[in-house]
Every structure is written in C-alpha cells, then in structure tokens.
Amino acid sequence: MKLNFYILLLCLSSIGITSWGRNATPTSHLTVLQLNIWQEGSIVEGGFEAIADEVAQVDADIVFFSEVRNYNGTCFISRIIEALKKRGKTYYGEHNPLDVGILSKYNISQQEIIYPKDSGCGSILKATIGIAGHTIAVYSAHLDYKNYACYLPRGYNGSTWKKMTQPVHNADSILAANRIAFREEAIEVFIENARQDIAEGAIVLLGGDFNEPSHLDWQEDTKDLWDHNGVVINWDCSSILCKEGFKDTYRTLYPNPVTHPGFTFPSDNDKMPVSKLTWAPDADERDRIDFIYFYPNQDITPISSMILGPSRSIVKSQRIEENTEDNFITPKGIWPSDHKGVIATFRISPQ
C-alpha cells in the first residue's frame, strides 16, 4: 500500500483547481470523491466533523454522499458546506429530500431528482456543472440495500441477514434474488437520462454506493477468494453500465481484482465494536460496492484512483490489515463510516 506517494499525487493533481465558483479558471484535472457517510455521521461519535475533515483532506472538486438523512428538519448540505468553510474550503450544493447529496467547488447550474420520481427504493440525484468549458452532468446514487444477494454464496440471507444452512452456488438463483431489489431499475433510469446528456455533448460521471458488487470482481480469477465459494456471476448494475459503454474508473486503472480488490465494505472503524460493522460475522464479506463511473470520450481521461479510509477491513469478525496493492489515503483522525470512500482524478481537456 503506497500511502505517501499517492497523497503527494493527490495534492499535485489539485494544482490549478483552486479557483471556485461561476467564474472559475478552466482546469485540466478534476478530482471526485464518493463516500457513504453512515447515517450522516451520526453513528460514530464526532462523525459529522470527521466527514468535514475527510472532505477537506481530499480537497475533491466534486463530492458524492450516500446516507444523507437531514435529521430533525436540518439540511445536511448546508451544514457540511458551513463546516467546510470553517476549514478554508468553499463548496456549493443544494438541499434535496433524498438520501444522497452533491457538493461542487463550481456553481451548480441545475439540480434535479432522477430516481425515484414516484415510487421505488434507492435514490439518484443529478447536478449540472460547468468546468473548463464543458458541461458536466454528475449523478449521485444510493441504490436499494435490500436483497443483498452477494451474501448468498457466503451462506447468509441478503434479506434477513441470518446465516443459512449452506451457501447458494447457482448464479441464476443468486441473480433472481438480486433482482427482487430495485437496483437494476434505478440504473436503467440513470442510463435513460445520461443518454440525453451524452447526445448533448456533456461529460457524464456517476458515483454511488450500489449495494451490489461489480461483475468485474466476480469472475474466474476470484471464484475461490473472499468466500465467493466457486461462484462466477455477472452482477446486474455493473453489467448494464458496461454494456452501455460506461467505465468503472477503479477497474479501468487497476484491471486485476486480485492485486487491487479495492474493497469498500465492510471497513474497519476503531471507534466501533466489530459487531456493529459486520452483517455476516462468520464470512469474508468484503466487496467493492462503492463506485465512480464515467462515460469515455476524447475530453476525459482517468489518471488515478485511491481508496479513502482505514487500510483495515472486517473479515469473519476480525479486524485485519489489507495485504493488497490498493492505494489508500488514510483518515486524518476519526473515521465516520462503515464503508471506505473512493477517489478518482480525471484529466479534462479544456474547450
């Protein structure tokens, strides 16, 4: 794990992107953060301030939040913008009633709810931002948490979270259980909207907690790792996005899931007992379920991606240090989540 080098890389990638707001100077680099904030930082003592600390540390241009709550009539986006201002950081964002949120160093020209319109499970929020002469459509997603079917091969029920008598090894049965959730429907709605953005020449980014792994991480090379128990499976959301032409930033840069698994859940958190961090206490439940996707064109190129959070994970109710080639930015202090975040930096060609 190459910590110091990648902290330096992140800092260097931010050069030239410190002019914020409507009259921002065109930039050649764009850094994006996806972070599940575990019920708005309320689970871990000091969690809200820790969220602000980590956003300030990463200094991302765009931040996607999952598990926004707006407790007791408060506005999380307004609160976090004020907390970041006290740390010398200026961000823009707008309130919304969903459990996701978007921050930007650049003014947001429009924000709209994409999913659900009427009913459904999960949330997708869209914001439109102008950067370096480009229109950038950014989408923040938190998909349905129910029917967490990647637990089935590990011998746990993804709806009741109870241990089963034996694992499920049949990929078709696992996918049938997976499709009871509304994750696939949400991604289809995203694609319908993103197609219009792409047709109009916009750069499109999607960040989110999918509550579902990637098919790229569940193939022959990993079937005997991490309690996959011999299962090879093409998970729905990542497969749909791949077919549509979207690229998983982390896997684009690190195509080998054995050397760079990029696990984002369950993260260790030294402020919490292990029992609060695991849902499958006798299994290796590690997966990469937090993502940053982009639609490739000549104007956007991914140049780096890192994991934000502790370099430890929970495996069979034990705190273990990851022995991988993943690159970590470790927390400044308190870690506010049971997930790890994902950071991606892109080169943007100015218009």
State each model region's role:
Residues 13-16:
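N-terminal signal peptide c-region/cleavage motif recognized by signal peptidases
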